[in-house]
């Protein structure tokens, strides 16, 4: 899933990941331009050289990094090699009574949350990007005995790259003679998770997914944490804990996919489907003018830290092949690509010169490297292109426009459509999933839900059924720019035409008036369509339609989309979704500031915002914030509640005290004048008692109040 400028494409000129120190700028040699820019109020952007140096330093010093007060924990499955990593957020205790010298504290349980960072959040992990991550799934793949290791890569292009000595300094495992040898299904075998699921086999990957989706729900015993409102799932099957059998059944039905190429054993199993947690994709990649391999590895790690469930490498520069190898070997999440981008590079950017042979070799090249899913724009048919003529924004999908131009220049049917069965045969040999691209998606709300968009959607529905014939896991891509009132129609039509295959959308963006804030405008649409049933959301950054995003833009886009995905999970009634909300709400009510930060999606920003206005250490435990101050904080009533509870007589229950107080207030009012007098009396009594909302009422006070009320 990509947009015309969403490619995080950031540089590719000569990208030596093992570059000598001389390639990193020496601060003493950098000209001092402060005098020249002293009048400017705009901070000077770092140079390309500085950005690359920063990225080089990042990967040279890369070590596991965990959020404050969080731990990496593992839950074991049925065998010791099924270890599912999660992030455990530790909480502080709650004050429930006692005195300053002898406080009575109540333990708050740790909260376990989904963790996309893999080894990058495990302090015990040994991280070395030049060696790649541990091959988590290697033994599972070998145990099935349905694949073979090839003597060498079979792609013509890969062989050409390997024969080019000038690229040695760029290769993964640079300086080593070791070459990653790909695997492929044995002749006549199918090795997809869909194939196994249809055979009734629960794979280790399926068991892993079930444990991961539940997030240790069974261990949560706290009544407050387990509270949740009834969800509205629009026909989705949520609300019960996930089992491995349920995962198998959903994959077998085609309603979910587990995108895991057999040549990407480093990836941790995850699932995409509307009956599971909503997932978020982030885009990275180099281009002909910006970025380096170092930067792309840095962005990969950064994206997983902030919650990217999958990452798409949308590289378009000279070193696509080498960049992708580094990314895959260091990625704990599935990697997707748009193969037509690289195929276009191979024909020097001339769409008319594309051929099936060039594209097929590109698929083999990427499948043997370990790409987990391909976006294929096979639904852009020749007869659909004229339907876009009256659009405000025409064809905005890069892949869609490439194939539209090819179709028109040759006046032939899209070769991706014509050769779709061959594509499926190739994919199932590596368990590469297909993401059927929406080349006709609208690029403005003025073009939403038009004939071209829905004609392509119907074709994608035909193609998904063909893919299922070959046991190829498949998802459907969707828009785009859709106003709020038209979003549900998109989801309904996708479910109807595509057999409930998972939906994967870019947004949708619900208005076109906010450049610079499209992570908001699209995040709203993303939350809505995810609630209606969309399984995965492709993030949008603040730079959408404006430029290439930097690291902070990537973080902003991911946070916006994690909010959208989580909001949909809560609305659908996913069994474990609301636990984190409840924990944070309880921490907020109890003024446990550090827990509030740590339970949030972005602890760093939350902490910084609080400290910006109240930086003193005492403010870290204060029972107010700068919004209302100590006198007007609505949540300060928690102190009154505690005082009320502590002052109750030991012989009586809280319920008895409330009932006694209620009975004491029952007086007979006969006239408006009596009512006014009684209200005035109660006002005076409230002020005289200290003007506290919650007060202790013992028997003597009760009797006095009753007497005063009767006298009045």
From Swiss-Prot:
Catalyzed reactions per annotation: 5-amino-1-(5-phospho-beta-D-ribosyl)imidazole + S-adenosyl-L-methionine = 4-amino-2-methyl-5-(phosphooxymethyl)pyrimidine + CO + 5'-deoxyadenosine + formate + L-methionine + 3 H(+)
EC annotation from Swiss-Prot or TrEMBL: 4.1.99.17
Binding-site positions, [4Fe-4S] cluster: 625, 628, 633
Binding site for substrate: 283, 312, 341, 377, 397-399, 438-441, 477, 504
Pathway connected to this protein: Cofactor biosynthesis; thiamine diphosphate biosynthesis
Entry GO CC: cytosol
Function text: Catalyzes the synthesis of the hydroxymethylpyrimidine phosphate (HMP-P) moiety of thiamine from aminoimidazole ribotide (AIR) in a radical S-adenosyl-L-methionine (SAM)-dependent reaction.
Name the UniProt record assigns to this protein: Phosphomethylpyrimidine synthase
Native species: Shewanella putrefaciens (strain CN-32 / ATCC BAA-453)
Gene that encodes the chain: thiC
């Amino acid at each position: 899933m990509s947009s015309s400028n969403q490619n995080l494409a950031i540089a590719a000129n000569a990208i030596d990941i093992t570059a000598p120190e001389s390639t990193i700028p020496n601060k003493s040699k950098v000209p001092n331009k402060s005098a020249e820019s002293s009048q400017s109020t705009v901070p000077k952007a770092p140079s390309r050289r500085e950005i690359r140096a920063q990225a080089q330093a990042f990967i040279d010093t890369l070590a596991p990094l965990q959020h404050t007060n969080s731990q990496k924990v593992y839950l074991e499955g049925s065998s010791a090699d099924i270890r599912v990593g999660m992030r455990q957020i530790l909480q502080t205790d709650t004050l429930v009574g006692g005195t300053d010298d002898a406080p009575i504290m109540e333990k708050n349980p740790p909260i376990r949350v989904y963790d996309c960072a893999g080894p990058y959040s495990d302090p015990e992990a040994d991280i070395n990007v030049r060696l790649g991550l541990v091959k988590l799934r290697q033994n599972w793949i070998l145990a099935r005995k349905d694949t073979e290791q090839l003597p060498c890569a079979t792609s013509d292009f890969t062989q050409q790259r390997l024969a080019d000595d000038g690229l040695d300094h760029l290769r993964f495992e640079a300086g080593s003679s070791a070459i990653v040898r790909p695997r492929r299904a044995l002749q006549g075998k199918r090795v997809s998770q869909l194939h196994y699921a249809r055979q009734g086999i629960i794979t280790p990957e399926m068991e892993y997914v079930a444990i991961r989706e539940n997030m240790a729900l069974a261990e949560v015993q706290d009544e407050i944490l387990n509270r949740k409102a009834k969800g509205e799932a629009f026909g989705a099957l949520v609300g019960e804990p996930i089992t491995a059998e349920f995962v198998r059944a959903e994959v077998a039905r085609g309603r979910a996919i587990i995108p895991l190429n057999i040549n990407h054993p480093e990836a941790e199993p995850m699932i995409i489907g509307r009956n599971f947690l909503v997932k978020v994709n982030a885009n990275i990649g180099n281009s002909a003018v910006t970025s380096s391999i170092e930067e792309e590895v840095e962005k990969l790690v950064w994206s997983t830290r902030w919650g990217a469930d999958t990452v798409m490498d949308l590289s378009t520069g000279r070193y696509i092949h080498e960049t992708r190898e580094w990314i895959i070997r260091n990625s704990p999440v599935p990697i997707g690509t748009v193969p037509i981008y690289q195929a276009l590079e191979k024909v020097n950017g001339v769409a008319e010169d594309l051929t099936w042979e060039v594209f097929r070799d590109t698929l083999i090249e990427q499948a043997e490297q370990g790409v987990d899913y391909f976006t294929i724009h096979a639904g852009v048919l020749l007869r659909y292109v004229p339907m876009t003529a009256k659009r405000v924004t025409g064809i905005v999908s890069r892949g869609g426009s490439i194939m539209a131009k090819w179709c028109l220049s040759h006046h032939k049917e899209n070769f991706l459509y014509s050769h779709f069965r061959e594509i499926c045969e190739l994919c199932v040999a590596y368990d590469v999933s297909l993401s059927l691209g929406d080349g006709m998606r609208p690029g403005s709300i003025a073009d939403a839900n038009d004939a071209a968009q829905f004609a392509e959607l119907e074709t994608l529905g035909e193609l998904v059924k063909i893919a299922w014939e070959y046991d190829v896991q498949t998802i459907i891509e969707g828009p785009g720019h859709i106003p709020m009132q038209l979003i549900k129609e998109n989801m309904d039509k996708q479910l109807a035409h595509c057999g409930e295959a998972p939906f994967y959308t870019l947004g949708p963006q619900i208005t076109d008036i906010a450049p610079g804030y499209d992570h908001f405008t699209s995040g709203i649409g993303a939350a809505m369509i995810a609630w209606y049933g969309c399984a995965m959301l492709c993030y949008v950054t603040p730079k959408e339609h404006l430029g290439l995003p930097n690291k902070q833009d990537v973080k902003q886009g991911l946070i916006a989309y994690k909010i959208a995905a989580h909001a949909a999970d809560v609305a659908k009634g996913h069994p474990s979704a609301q636990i984190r909300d409840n924990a944070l709400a309880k921490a907020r009510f109890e003024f446990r500031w550090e827990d509030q930060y740590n339970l949030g999606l972005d602890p760093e920003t939350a902490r910084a915002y609080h400290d910006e206005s109240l930086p003193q250490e005492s403010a870290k435990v204060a029972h107010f914030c700068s919004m209302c101050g100590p006198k007007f904080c609505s949540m300060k009533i928690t102190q009154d509640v505690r005082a009320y509870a502590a002052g109750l007589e030991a012989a009586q229950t809280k319920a008895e005290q409330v009932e006694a107080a209620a009975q004491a207030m029952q007086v007979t009012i006969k006239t408006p004048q009596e009512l006014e007098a009684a209200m005035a009396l109660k006002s005076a009594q409230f002020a005289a008692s200290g003007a506290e909302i919650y007060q202790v009422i013992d028997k003597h006070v009760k009797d006095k109040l009753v007497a005063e009320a009767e006298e009045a």
